[in-house]
UniProtKB/Swiss-Prot annotation:
<keyword id="KW-0206">Cytoskeleton</keyword>
<feature type="region of interest" description="Disordered">
    <location>
        <begin position="201"/>
        <end position="231"/>
    </location>
</feature>
<dbReference type="InterPro" id="IPR031410">
    <property type="entry name" value="SAXO4"/>
</dbReference>
<protein>
    <recommendedName>
        <fullName>Stabilizer of axonemal microtubules 4</fullName>
    </recommendedName>
</protein>
<dbReference type="GO" id="GO:0036126">
    <property type="term" value="C:sperm flagellum"/>
</dbReference>
<dbReference type="Pfam" id="PF15691">
    <property type="entry name" value="PPP1R32"/>
</dbReference>
<keyword id="KW-0966">Cell projection</keyword>
<dbReference type="GO" id="GO:0005929">
    <property type="term" value="C:cilium"/>
</dbReference>
<keyword id="KW-0282">Flagellum</keyword>
<dbReference type="GO" id="GO:0030317">
    <property type="term" value="P:flagellated sperm motility"/>
</dbReference>
<dbReference type="GO" id="GO:0005737">
    <property type="term" value="C:cytoplasm"/>
</dbReference>
<dbReference type="GO" id="GO:0160111">
    <property type="term" value="C:axonemal A tubule inner sheath"/>
</dbReference>
<dbReference type="GO" id="GO:0019902">
    <property type="term" value="F:phosphatase binding"/>
</dbReference>
<keyword id="KW-0969">Cilium</keyword>
<keyword id="KW-0963">Cytoplasm</keyword>
<comment type="subunit">
    <text>Microtubule inner protein component of sperm flagellar doublet microtubules. Interacts with PPP1CA.</text>
</comment>
Length: 428
């Protein structure tokens, strides 16, 4: 059995209320709904007024001249051009000449026939001369009203070389720049003898003349061969190696084949040095007698050091690059399998990219475990709320609303415990 509900203090809005809500299913009845609510209330459907940008537009009334053609002709003629848009003025309909237009002044018309107005981007000289005067032709004192301008002291520019100081305060000369009118020196008409100018011999610049000798490349003149560019420290290697083209004059010697040279190619006159000169080159085919006499000697001439027995050939050793490399490291992923493409860079700088099973989730076709995304983390899991009990609902509601629900629905009570025989409780 449920005890009596507390009556509480009568609030002002309860006194103004027209009564409790008669709808038993309306559990969310508020004080505003009980005081001012109406049954079967439906909000009024409003009309779409458009956006704020469009609603702020003022209504535009388009004027047509034929509105005042009958009763007010003078007003129509005055306002016919006032309500014309720029587009209608600029883009007029096409007009075909009917023969009544005057003939052009020039026989050969140069301007286009598309537009009648002459579009000129450059101001003609005649219009410029009406505004700007040429002080070089007339002078500032020759024209009335062009006396030197007197500016206040605060408006005067005190810096050196001001433009307003030229031509009696009227600026630079007509159609000339500041540099041309101020800093360009006019050529003197005096002879060179009076100017005392003398032109000496052409010498090298200070960069090549005073250049220091290279301590690494430079050799004393006693150790350098004649004609060696090392003797000239001011001369670059490019000038010594890449000489200018010299055309033949006719007194040069004819090209002659040197002894022991090959006739297969004439591009290079110097034979390349073979790796093992002691072994004669293999001869797969027997050559003719004519070809044999132009071959190089079969036995290489020994030098004086080799004849004295002082020439020795050591064992073949690896280069310094292979000696300085660290020892070979097997692959940590598969110790039984050598890494064929293991380089020094891979040994020194470890690659932090997962391989093998660690990269299974990133390969194409691999099954990846499902991970919660940002949408699932930010959104709580939707759960159904438990069925509210009548006791908890009555405790949360206002006492006036609770009494109203009990008076309307007599079975709106808490279910008795399972030990009771009666399932429902009779109202008080």
């Amino acid at each position: 059995m449920m005890g009596k509900l507390p009556l509480g203090v009568v609030s002002p809005y309860v006194k103004m209320s027209s009564g409790g809500c008669t709808d038993p299913l309306k559990f969310y009845a508020t004080s505003y709904c009980t005081a001012y609510g109406r049954e079967d209330f439906k909000p009024r459907v409003g009309s779409h007024r458009g956006t704020g940008y469009k609603s702020n537009y003022r209504p535009v009334v388009f004027y047509q001249p034929h509105l005042d053609a009958l009763d007010n002709t003078a007003t129509g003629e005055q306002g016919c051009n006032n309500f014309q848009t720029v587009t209608s003025q600029s883009y007029r309909p096409l007009e075909v000449p009917d023969g009544t237009h005057p003939l052009p002044w020039n026989l050969h018309q140069t301007n286009s026939g598309y537009s009648r107005e002459k579009a000129s981007a450059v101001t003609p000289i005649k219009e410029v001369r009406k505004v700007h005067f040429d002080t070089q032709d007339y002078g500032p004192q020759a024209i009335t009203g062009l006396e030197p301008k007197d500016a206040p002291l605060l408006h005067q520019q005190q810096n050196k070389g001001s433009l307003e100081w030229e031509n009696a305060g009227h600026g630079p000369r007509f159609m000339t720049s500041e540099y041309n009118s101020k800093y360009l020196k006019e050529p003197s008409h005096q002879p060179d003898l009076l100017q005392k100018n003398s032109v000496g011999a052409k010498e090298e610049t200070g960069f090549t003349e005073e250049s220091n000798k290279n301590p690494i490349v430079f050799q004393p003149p006693s150790q350098a061969l004649p004609g060696d560019p090392v003797l000239l420290p001011g001369r670059s290697v490019t000038k010594s190696d890449f000489l200018p083209i010299s055309h033949p004059h006719g007194d040069e010697f004819l090209p002659v084949l040197a002894r022991g040279s090959e006739r297969e190619t004439g591009f290079s006159r110097v034979n390349e040095r073979t790796l093992n000169p002691r072994v004669p080159p293999p001869c797969p085919e027997p050559s003719s007698m004519n070809h044999w006499q132009f071959q190089s000697p079969q036995r290489m001439q020994q030098t004086n050091v080799a004849l004295l027995g002082r020439e020795t050939v050591g064992n073949k050793e690896p280069s310094g690059f292979s000696l300085n490399n660290p020892s070979y490291v097997r692959s940590p992923y598969d110790p039984d399998m050598d890494n064929r493409y293991l380089t020094t860079y891979n040994q020194g700088y470890f690659e932090n990219i997962p391989k093998g099973l660690d990269r299974e989730g990133w390969t194409r076709g691999g099954l990846q475990p499902q991970k919660p995304g940002g949408y699932a983390l930010n959104q709580p899991v939707t759960r159904l709320e438990a069925t509210p009990t009548p006791t908890e609902s009555l405790r949360r509601l206002h006492p006036h609303l609770g009494r109203t629900l009990i008076s309307v629905d007599p079975f709106y009570r808490t279910a008795p415990p399972s030990g009771h025989v009666s399932r429902f409780t009779a109202p008080n």
